[in-house]
Swiss-Prot record:
Nucleotide-binding as UniProt keyword: yes
Protein name as it appears in the record: CTP synthase
Further remarks about this protein from its record: CTPSs have evolved a hybrid strategy for distinguishing between UTP and CTP. The overlapping regions of the product feedback inhibitory and substrate sites recognize a common feature in both compounds, the triphosphate moiety. To differentiate isosteric substrate and product pyrimidine rings, an additional pocket far from the expected kinase/ligase catalytic site, specifically recognizes the cytosine and ribose portions of the product inhibitor.
Active site residues according to the UniProt entry: C381 (nucleophile), H507, E509
């Protein structure tokens, strides 16, 4: 029978519930179990697709085109699985589904209520995730903190699941904070005690408490927490700040967390073999070289907006025993006068995805600098579109060239709406989303990176290169190295007379893994290292 683990959080948000859940998933997978994982977000948006990155961070796109929480990126990178649309559920999705059923008459004229209708819908999403993947273990992270009014239906639903399928098939893990008061020189357990009290008042008794802390947790403190929270002392797990995220699974294993889980769920699996993972962490901790990449974006104040990009750069660096340092450059501050000062000390330049016109001209200046000074360049989504616009303006001399998204009245719409997007009015869930094939031209940097004729990558865009300009740009040395199989849509562009200048319409960062870097990032970092060594 499928087992279910629920991860909740208390005291404050951003405690690392997602990393805890992902780390446990990796440990259980390495015990030979088929693991899937999902995130329940209590906000009323249907998905984060239309939310500002300042509100939510990165939008992570799955193979099947779901726009999801950034924690799914952690899940995929840690557990090395590809998730789907069932892996992220919001209050908005739940209510939308229930209301549609009510309109269809599926409730037979009954009064639709939070209990049982909303809670039953939540439970169905939990069970469906296990059914769709045939999982041995389903890990479900509940977003927000215990006590939030938005979370109550989710907590009630996961409480009911234990009654539905039995205590041996359900486990509750609660993540909390033990703050350190510097002035007093003390760590305080009271917030954790109150958080667990709140959870228990809702009918959920945690089986494991994971305490986030800056300082070591003494045995006396663990005993105190165990007493007040009514759990075994060994089930108080310390989650101290780590030098690398990838060390967290090893820390949890050292404290036997995965064994406690298996004992509770009656899973008789051998211990997790973490030899390869340990080697990865040792490599990460002992990188001998450095390279610096400029990330020119408009959300640089909130680095979570580009978390998969940064992780993909790091993964690529691991292959070359290199620590990739990211220099955050606010695109709004970049001008032709100061670009040398802002990016001149870096070994490569990356322009990531985005929407809207803010910071666009600064990104174009940075791209021009990379092109003219032979600095390795990687453009992603909007970065690819702006690389095309920069070339049209400054090489072809098409003054005023732009994207119709940024300037609907541009005389040269180098980037324009996809034909199928012309009549779309809704913003949410209407982009070109998910995994699509890309055919690569031989003897190009893109082909050399992948070494395959056709690759599949994840997309999230509404605008596309305007084929009207392809012949003139090709004549001038602009290479269309990747297209859709029918040749209609431009997927990858690069420059002929440049050491390494590649830009992709898709989001290659979404499929990178710590032990298997994404090919374009791998070659971009290699080119950046070569550039540094040649200076």
């Amino acid at each position: 029978m499928t087992k279910y683990i629920f991860v909740t959080g208390g005291v404050v948000s951003s405690l690392g519930k997602g990393i805890t859940a992902a780390s446990l998933g990796r440990l259980l997978k390495n015990r030979g179990l088929n693991v899937t994982i999902q995130k329940f977000d209590p906000y009323i948006n249907v998905d984060p697709g239309t939310m500002s990155p300042y509100q939510h961070g990165e939008v992570f796109v799955t193979d099947d085109g779901a726009e999801t929480d950034l924690d799914l990126g952690h899940y995929e990178r840690f557990i090395d699985i590809n998730l789907n649309k069932y892996s992220n559920v919001t209050t908005g999705k739940i209510y939308s589904s229930v209301l549609q059923k009510e309109r269809r008459g599926e409730y037979l004229g009954g009064t639709v209520q939070v209990i049982p209708h909303i809670t039953n819908e939540i439970k169905e999403r939990v069970y469906r995730s296990g059914r769709e993947t045939n999982a041995d273990v389903v890990i479900t992270e509940i977003g927000g903190t215990v006590g939030d009014i938005e979370s109550l239906p989710f907590l009630e639903a996961i409480r009911q699941i234990k009654s539905d399928i039995g205590r041996d098939n359900v486990m509750y893990i609660h993540c909390t904070l033990i703050p350190y008061l510097k002035a007093a020189g003390e760590m305080k357990t009271k917030p954790t005690q109150h958080s667990v009290k709140e959870l228990r008042s809702l009918g959920i008794q945690p089986n494991i408490i994971v305490v986030r802390t800056e300082m070591p947790v003494s045995q006396d403190m663990k005993d105190k927490l165990a007493l007040f929270c009514d759990i075994d002392t060994k089930a108080v797990i310390e989650a101290r700040d780590a030098d690398t995220l990838y060390a967290v699974p090893l820390s949890l294993q050292e404290q036997n967390m995965d064994q406690i889980v298996c004992d509770h769920l009656k899973l008789d699996n051998p211990a997790a073999d973490m030899t390869e993972w340990t080697a990865l962490v040792e490599k990460v901790r002992n990188l001998s070289k450095k390279t610096k990449i400029a990330l020119v974006g408009k959300y640089v104040e909130l680095q979570d907006a580009y978390i998969s990009v940064v992780e993909a750069l790091r993964h690529a660096g691991y292959s070359f025993d290199t620590d990739v340092e990211v220099k955050w450059v606010n695109a709004e501050h970049v001008t032709a006068e100061n670009v040398q000062e802002l990016v001149g000390d870096t070994d490569g330049i990356l322009v990531p995805g985005g929407f809207g016109d803010r910071g666009v001209e600064g990104k174009i200046v940075a791209i021009q600098y990379a092109r003219e000074n032979k600095v390795p360049f990687l453009g992603i989504c909007l970065g690819m579109q702006l690389a095309s616009i920069e070339f049209a303006r400054n090489v072809l001399g098409l003054e005023g060239a732009n994207s119709s998204e940024i300037n609907p009245d541009t005389p040269y719409a180098i980037i324009d709406l996809l034909p199928e997007q012309k009549d779309v009015e809704d913003l949410g869930g209407t982009l070109r989303l998910g995994l699509y094939p890309c055919k690569l031209a031989e003897e190009t940097n893109a082909y050399n990176a992948y070494n395959e004729p056709v690759v599949y990558e994840r997309h999230r865009h509404r605008y596309e290169f305007n084929n009207q300009f392809r012949p003139d740009m090709e004549k001038a040395g602009f290479v269309f190295s990747g297209t859709s199989p029918d040749g209609r849509l431009v997927e990858i562009v690069e420059l002929k007379d440049h050491p390494w200048f590649v830009a992709a319409q898709f989001h290659p960062e979404l499929v990178s893994r710590p032990n298997r870097p994404q090919p374009l990032f791998h070659d971009f970092v290699r080119a950046s290292i070569t550039n540094k060594e040649s200076k």
